[in-house]
Every structure is written in structure tokens, then in C-alpha cells.
Amino acid sequence: MAEIYDFDKSAWDVKGSIAPIRPKTYSDGRLIPQVRVIDPGFGDRKDECFMYIFLLGIVEDSDPLSPPRGRTFGSLPLGVGKSTAKPEELLKEVTDLDIVVRRTAGLNEKLVFYNNTPLSLLTPWKKILTTGSVFNANQVCNAVNMIPLDTPQRFRVVYMSITRLSDSGYYTVPRKMLEFRSANAVAFNLLVTLEIDRDTEPGRPAAGGLGLSEATFMVHVGNFRRKKNEAYSADYCKMKIEKMGLVFALGGIGGTSLHIRSTGKMSKTLHAQLGFKKTLCYPLMDINEDLNRLLWRSRCKIVRIQAVLQPSVPQEFRIYDDVIINDDQGLFKVL
């Protein structure tokens, strides 16, 4: 059974929302490029020039003999760079890029991006733009099945989202801990409820396709574990969580991201699990790609955050990424 603890609204009321990018068009119907700047931090970093850039645009035909035909909406995460350029200057340069898109496959369907345009202000992001990048197609594309293979494709940027990294120290994405399990431990998870503005894009289905204006996602923070062969009580874990002084914000890493900062005292074991960092980042691109795509241009805000305390999944429970059928002896077995 899970024990649930509600955080006070003051933990996210300052930076727990993201403004929408509302589509604007020219007289001929083409989308007008726009830029959105998000700052989920405290602003205590001395050097304020670090930023994360996330591009949104249209995957379209690149046939010079015919008008471009839009295939689907997509994104391109450029990552972190250091720049003093104005957002409008960066937007102008990204809209002039000639970004080629190619559909391929590995373990799953993927999209390959590479740029053919010389860089100026975007030089801090030259590695991903000039050497190319490969992404899981479902993470960066609304409908990869609409992208043809017999027609050259390009990625035309129409929106740019900039996330300023203004917190001091490092932003940690605790990937190594997300599947960590321990006997007699209590898993510390967070259940986040978002309110989504359904009027951002008229005619677009609501979250979950059920006419709802709210959506939830869950993240794993770490485990509370005793040295003795016993588990902590839920009340004791709640006390430890309260002492951490957690503050939450929404950012634009990978589309939409949850940022957590501990302003209080953290359990030594949990602090070690998180790499001795107190500023954490959870991109929805990795956690819930379907919800992340829904939020690409929408306005959203945190309306509730709950700490969910659950028994850590026993190590005897195997985690299956897939199911393999073995019929070597004429019998089907699930391995």
C-alpha cells in the first residue's frame, strides 16, 4: 500500500507554470516564428548566460520543384549552450537554418537531424547542429508514420523555447537512480498534477482524450533505507521529506520539465543517491513522451504535488523491457 503526503501550494506557486505559445499567422496562413523564455531557477548563478534551447517546427517536403507540403509537427532539442545573444536574435538565426530530417530505425523508429547552414550566434550549439543527432521518433515527432522515405524532408523551425539555467551548481537528471531497487527500502516518488489550457490550440483534444483539463505524471526521486534489516515507517519518511524543504518549478528541458530544489536538510543516503546534488531536473521527454508532446505549445501549471511512499520493488521482481518467446523444445516459454 502507498502512503500519500500533500505538499503545500507555496512549494510551487512562484514558478509552477509555463506560458503558452499561441499560434499567429501571416496573411498567407504561414505561422509567424515566436520565442518563449522560461526561468525555473532561483537566479543565484553568477553567470546568467547558460541556456537550454528547444526548437519546435514542421517536418515538410524539401522538393524545390513544388510547394512544401507539411507532414507533421516535430521538435529538436539543441541542449545547453552559453550565449549573451538576445532571444529574438537567436530566433532569427534558427529560422534560417536548413535542417534535414531523415527517418530511420534501430531498436525503435528514429529521426535523424542535421543542419547545412553556417552558424553564427548558434555556434555554442554547433556540435548537435553540424555533426547531426538521432532521437527516438516518438519523443520528437507527433506522427512519424506521416513522414515519407521517397521525398527529401526538412525541419522548418517556427517556435523556439529557451530555458535559462539560473540556479547555482549543477542540474542533475538522476537517470541512474530511476530503476534502483533495494530490499526493505521505502521508495520516494512524486505524483504531479498539471492543469492544461485547452484553449491554447482550438480543436485540439484535451489531455487523455476524455475532455479533461488535468493530467498527471509520476517521478521517482530515491529510496529511504535503514542500515538495519527493517524499513522506515511512513511517518518517519514524511518527516524527512518535510525537512528537505523542496521547491518545484516547470521548465522547458526536452519540451516540459519538472525542476526540484532542496533548500533544507537532506537524508545522507538520499543525497548520495542523487550524486550529492540538490537541484534535480526531470524532463517529461523521458518520463511521459505522450504528455510531453501534448504540452509542447500549451499553457500548463502545477495544481498539486504529492509525495507517494511505496515499498521499493523487490529485487526478485525482474523488470522486463520486452517479452521473449522461446520455443527451442516445442514449448513456448516467457523468459
Curated annotation (Swiss-Prot):
Protein name from the UniProt record:
Matrix protein
Q: Which UniProt keywords apply?
A: Viral envelope protein, Viral matrix protein, Virion
Entry's localization field: Virion
Please explain the role this protein plays, according to its UniProt record: The M protein has a crucial role in virus assembly and interacts with the RNP complex as well as with the viral membrane.
InterPro entries linked to this entry: Matrix_C, Matrix_N, Matrix_Paramyxo_C, Matrix_Paramyxo_N
**What Pfam families does UniProt report for this protein, alphabetically?**
Matrix_Paramyxo_C, Matrix_Paramyxo_N
Q: Which family does it belong to?
A: Belongs to the morbillivirus/respirovirus/rubulavirus M protein family.
The terms describing its cellular component in GO are: viral envelope
* Gene Ontology terms describing biological process: virion assembly
Which organism is this entry from?
Answer: Rinderpest virus (strain RBOK)
One GO MF term attached to the UniProt entry? structural constituent of virion
